[in-house]
Amino acid sequence: MTDTPDPAAVLSPAVKAAILSEALPYIRRFHGKTIVVKYGGNAMTEERLQRSFAHDVVLLKLVGLNPVVVHGGGPQIDDALRRLGKQGTFVQGMRVTDAETMEVVEWVLGGQVQQDIVMMINEAGGKAVGLTGKDGMLLQARKKLMADKEKPGELLDIGLVGDVTRVEPAVVKALQDDQFIPVISPIGYGEDGTAYNINADVVAGKIAEVLGAEKLLMMTNTPGVLDKSGKLLRSLSAQTIDELFADGTISGGMLPKISSALDAAKNGVPSVHVVDGRVPHCLLLELLTDQGVGTMISAH
């Protein structure tokens, strides 16, 4: 399939100059600040969107922001499992992870996917370095047990799925100080060395909290958070989110995403947004323009 042209390619020089002028106050505001980006969805699988993402990240670094990328890789994991004759299973948006699946997760996320992202950013002119939770003890974790919605009071064991117990930010800060762009795979490690599969949205939220990030951007395959009629909700408060959870408007993979976004907002991240990763240059649109894209999550 032929890639659709980048919309920026058809803009006149005058329009491009106006866009750059609009970005200036935002560049000043965010200069030196950490921006955590959860990278996933179509933006990881379509070549045109991959290029625009890499260019956005490099540009943000060049103008003085400190981007940190936390990536997913669900479709790539599913493809690898299918080749082994396995079918992915999910509970409340979390992948059930047995030992064989965990080996696949480590290989796909910590190897193939991470290396592709690092190479893509480097080819765009940046300096990216890949990390997993094991590097510098970045992500310490324990086994996650989930509440059974069918049997109140009981817990579900979904295998080698983890909760983050501690984030050690030293290795990320050291890379930032040396002008590198960290690219983090969401694999945590227990005290006994057991590897855990951790939802990338959860990891992005925890990383943003510990690094004192100015913004957390979560890329998705929708315009943002939608109501039951499919209309974009531009902003969500904690109370509204609770209502959307209760009536089933937010479900599936959106559950951990919005829960993590809300936790990050409650724990001090000033600005949390769910953005449409299908839009080329969505990071620049959200960070450096008046309009922005997606849904803003507020703790209040």
UniProtKB/Swiss-Prot annotation:
Its main location: cytoplasm. Keywords: Amino-acid biosynthesis, Arginine biosynthesis, ATP-binding, Cytoplasm, Kinase, Nucleotide-binding, Transferase. HAMAP family: ArgB. Belongs to the acetylglutamate kinase family. ArgB subfamily. One of its GO terms (molecular function) is acetylglutamate kinase activity. The gene is argB. The record marks K38, K257 as: Transition state stabilizer. GO terms for biological process: arginine biosynthetic process via ornithine; L-arginine biosynthetic process. This is Acetylglutamate kinase. Catalyzes the ATP-dependent phosphorylation of N-acetyl-L-glutamate. Pathway: Amino-acid biosynthesis; L-arginine biosynthesis; N(2)-acetyl-L-ornithine from L-glutamate: step 2/4. Its EC number is 2.7.2.8. NCBIfam families: argB. PANTHER family: N-ACETYLGLUTAMATE SYNTHASE, N-ACETYLGLUTAMATE SYNTHASE, MITOCHONDRIAL. It catalyses: N-acetyl-L-glutamate + ATP = N-acetyl-L-glutamyl 5-phosphate + ADP. The keyword Cytoplasm applies.
